[in-house]
Amino acid sequence: MSFLSGLFGPICEIEVALNDSDTRKVSEIKTEEGKVEKHFLFYDGESVAGKVNIVFKQPGKRLEHHGIRIEFVGQIELFNDKSNTHEFVNLVKELALPGELTQSRSYDFEFMQVEKPYESYNGANVRLRYFLKVTIVRRLTDLVKEYDLIVHQLASYPDVNNSIKMEVGIEDCLHIEFEYNKSKYHLKDVIVGKIYFLLVRIKIQHMELQLIKKEITGIGPSTTTETETVAKYEIMDGAPVKGESIPIRLFIAGYDPTPTMRDVNKKFSVRYFLNLVLVDEEDRRYFKQQEIILWRKAPEKIRKRTNFHQRFEPQEPQASAEEPEI
């Protein structure tokens, strides 16, 4: 597979072909418009190598330039501030000195063992992307084309992965005990738990478990939080009784979430919460949120040769102003 730039006027087009394109995996990522794009998948520390092909479309033409270069770029873009684009990685390879092209030409490039410290991400208010950028420098207008890559950050099994167990309630009205089997889940994991009713003196009509994603961008007073309900799991529909125990099984893989991302380059975070919601007969809603960590498990082949590890320290979740917390 190669990346095709499209025409730059009538003279030439640019192609980028990776050396291992026949064997390298492809991954998907959603754009701001909700479309799904496929790009080659890379991990931290892997080299990026290939060829840049300048292909002439009209024989006999010539292209004067002031140099040709390729860059490997890692970039964070905040959608509410397009001018505040931050590059956390920028590697440059000069492919050609100033001169003139009269026919098609290929240039080899290689970025060795490239540091890729963060996962590719496309959210509501922020985008983190990696791309190759080819520039043909010209006197008036440069010819520039970008080719996106996808990066996944991998983690090993956490050293400690305690269960979550908590007793909550409303005094003399409702007391429940909920338990989740872990506090940290990989993206193909299953959330297993149970809800146990210790005291029920209000009429509960409906109960569900939600997987909530919070995207936090900015710092201090300029902080923006975008909340999305990734998944809903109906625990029960009807009134529970004292002593009743209800099991929970929520398959994370069916909802394709991202990993938890903590203070990425001091620009944004992505956090996940399990939100237990109860609705009574008067349509009043009660909830209890508990933060969990989502992480991407290394494939077996990679896990054998590399010791990936990420550590996360959960912070206290913030209560919603819209619903009373139990």
Swiss-Prot record:
Compartment list: Cytoplasm; Endosome membrane; Early endosome
UniProt keyword Cytoplasm present: yes
Keyword Transcription regulation: no
Primary location group: cytoplasm
InterPro entries cross-referenced by the UniProt entry: Arrestin-like_C (IPR014752), Vps26-related (IPR028934)
A GO CC term attached to the entry: cytosol
Gene3D superfamilies cross-referenced by the UniProt entry: 2.60.40.640
Keywords attached to this entry: Cytoplasm, Endosome, Membrane, Protein transport, Transport
Membrane topology: Peripheral membrane protein
GO biological-process terms attached to the record: intracellular protein transport; retrograde transport, endosome to Golgi
Domain of life: Eukaryota
Family: Belongs to the VPS26 family.
Summary of subunit composition and partner proteins: Component of the heterotrimeric retromer cargo-selective complex (CSC) which is believed to associate with variable sorting nexins to form functionally distinct retromer complex variants.
Job of this protein: Acts as a component of the retromer cargo-selective complex (CSC). The CSC is believed to be the core functional component of retromer or respective retromer complex variants acting to prevent missorting of selected transmembrane cargo proteins into the lysosomal degradation pathway. Retromer mediates retrograde transport of cargo proteins from endosomes to the trans-Golgi network (TGN).
Protein name: Vacuolar protein sorting-associated protein 26A-B
Upper taxonomic lineage: Eukaryota, Metazoa, Chordata, Craniata, Vertebrata
Gene (name only): vps26a-b
